[in-house]
Amino acid sequence: MRGRQKIAIVGAGLGGAAAATLLQQAGFDVEVFEQAPAFTRLGAGIHIGPNVMKIFRRMGLEQKLELMGSHPDFWFSRDGNTGDYLSRIPLGEFARREYGAAYITIHRGDLHALQIEAIQPGTVHFGKRLEKIVDEGDQVRLDFADGTHTVADIVIGADGIHSKIREELLGAEAPIYSGWVAHRALIRGVNLAQHADVFEPCVKWWSEDRHMMVYYTTGKRDEYYFVTGVPHEAWDFQGAFVDSSQEEMRAAFEGYHPTVQKLIDATESITKWPLRNRNPLPLWSRGRLVLLGDACHPMKPHMAQGACMAIEDAAMLTRCLQETGLSDHRTAFALYEANRKERASQVQSVSNANTWLYSQEDPAWVYGYDLYGQQLESGEAA
């Protein structure tokens, strides 16, 4: 006789970790399987909009995040060459008042560590590289490279753009290289202090075919981060990223504003990452398998909403499973897709176009969204 119903989550990134906590808080039995042997504080920043701070409020993490993160009063867009302001998008107290929560920027590793700590001890299993998925009718078996296996009633694929769960649903297909790369660097505050320039808390420098997004990643503002988007004809390197250099950055941003040049001068280590993508998927679930985040709608990071969409997915999937119960997972999955696909696809499209907040516009459709205030639209079971 089978025991209690169980949910397996493949991938313990920001979306998978959010799903684990939200599902556990809703009373579900959850296990998480992550292929990485452990997590490290990778050198990347992240924005958390009010739309997702409201989800962290439900998780009991909002106040901790507010203390950890930087709180920009504006998102500034500036001409990369002249420095002229293209837009001034109010955040800070305006965001709290108009959108219902704070807008913060934070180190991705600090956010991730907080999320992992919020999951019940013993839930997350590291070093679990998924090799095979077996549909056994009334359950799914997951076989891992270390020779172990597990069974679950449903499996959530939160395993990123190279998702094995997506591959099981739709077949093997490499993601599309976008033709752009992202340079990333964390800059110590002491390095910035050597320059008299004003380094704004959240600013995107633009020119015709490239940009640089810059912001603080801590409440103490002792760490400044930039991420770029630069055309790059081919990605023929091995691995997820390669080292870059000040020389490469100076060449890429030749003619840019002196403040940008000072940023490049202040860097100690720069990496370069390919920006990959997928076309919208024809389905998000089948049988006992369901996708969330980059596994089903990866996007270029130009709206600072990719991880936010994964966390929204996790919250909506939890809502739908609460609505139907795990025994009626097909209805839950149909509800989930019906209530997420349009929004996630719209964000994916705008993000890939790299037009977000270039000029003065109202971002309320993104930041003012309250997932828990949305009435569930009906979906037809797959």
Swiss-Prot record:
InterPro entries: FAD-bd (IPR002938), FAD-dep_Monooxygenase_BioMet (IPR050493), FAD/NAD-bd_sf (IPR036188). Keywords: Aromatic hydrocarbons catabolism, FAD, Flavoprotein, Monooxygenase, NAD, Oxidoreductase, Signal. Its EC number is 1.14.13.114. Induction: Repressed by NicR in the absence of 6-hydroxynicotinate (6HNA) inducer. In presence of 6HNA, repression is alleviated. Binds 1 FAD molecule per subunit. Gene3D superfamilies: FAD/NAD(P)-binding domain (3.50.50.60). It comes from the Bacteria. It is an enzyme of class 1 (oxidoreductase). FAD binds at residues 15, 34-35, 47, 108, 130, 294, 307-308. Transmembrane segments: none annotated. Disruption phenotype: Cells show a complete conversion of nicotinate to 6-hydroxynicotinate. Its cofactor is FAD. GO terms for biological process: nicotinate catabolic process. The active site is at 47 (proton acceptor), 215 (proton acceptor). It holds the Pfam family FAD_binding_3. Belongs to the 6-hydroxynicotinate 3-monooxygenase family. Flavin-dependent monooxygenase (FMO) that catalyzes the decarboxylative hydroxylation of 6-hydroxynicotinic acid (6-HNA) to 2,5-dihydroxypyridine (2,5-DHP) with concomitant oxidation of NADH, a step in the aerobic nicotinate degradation pathway. This is 6-hydroxynicotinate 3-monooxygenase. The lineage of its organism: Bacteria, Pseudomonadati, Pseudomonadota, Gammaproteobacteria, Pseudomonadales.
